[in-house]
């Protein structure tokens, strides 16, 4: 905040927690990731997003995940005939642990988690890091 920020996004740090209801397989993507595993992808409506690279993302790049129909109609601007994949199916599959048919969005530091923690542990670490950084300023 001292550098002029008015807010931060910190969702990724809470994914590999005991309280997160995502599957263990989904959480393992965060725990096993390296910095180079995170890349910018394009959503079916052309919006960029940061995600972990994986089999599904590579299949999308090769044109292997094109939808044949659209049972959901979740995004008005999404044209399934031009879309490289169905985002709702990909995110649903990933949340359920089927990472071969889905992917996980990620923050820039999402690869830093090394184990599943409780939210309480995450908050305590954030507080400790904050006070340490404040002392160094």
Regions found by a protein language model. Give the residues of each.
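Conserved active-site-proximal phosphate/metal-binding subdomains
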Residues: 1-137
């Amino acid at each position: 905040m001292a550098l002029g920020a008015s807010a931060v996004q910190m969702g990724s740090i809470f994914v590999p927690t005991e309280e997160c209801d995502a599957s263990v397989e989904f959480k393992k993507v965060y725990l096993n990731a390296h910095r180079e595993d995170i890349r910018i992808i394009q959503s079916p409506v052309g919006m960029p997003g940061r995600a972990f690279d994986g089999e599904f993302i590579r299949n999308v790049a090769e044109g292997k995940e094109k939808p044949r129909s659209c049972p959901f109609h979740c995004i008005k601007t999404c044209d399934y005939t031009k879309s490289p994949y169905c985002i709702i199916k990909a995110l649903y599959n990933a949340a359920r642990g089927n990472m071969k048919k889905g992917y996980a969005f990620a923050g820039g530091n999402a690869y830093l988690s090394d184990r599943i923690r409780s939210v309480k542990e995450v908050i305590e670490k954030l507080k400790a890091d904050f006070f340490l950084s404040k002392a160094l300023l």
